[in-house]
Amino acid sequence: EAEKCBZZPGWTKGGCETCGCAQKIVPCTRETKPNPQCPRKQCCIASAGFVRDAQGNCIKFEDCPK
């Protein structure tokens, strides 16, 4: 289950969000800004093994389409 989003986009204690299955790990700092192509809040945490699918759902990386 993905963490709940907080109101501040760009960083959570869990790490940073990627836009999708092609970007498994993205370096993340407290200054990380949301990807302009990925306007959702940062709550689908890449370092926890989650990514967004094409519909914007937060899924486990291993569940990405092969």
From Swiss-Prot:
Q: Signal peptide: which range, if any? A: none
Tell me the disulfide pairings in this chain: 5-28, 16-44, 19-58, 21-38, 43-64
Listed under GO cellular component are: extracellular region
Compartments, record wording: Secreted
Extract the GO molecular function terms from the UniProt entry: serine-type endopeptidase inhibitor activity
Alphabetized, the UniProt keywords read: Disulfide bond, Protease inhibitor, Secreted, Serine protease inhibitor
What's the protein name? Trypsin inhibitor
Task: List the source organism.
Answer: Ascaris suum
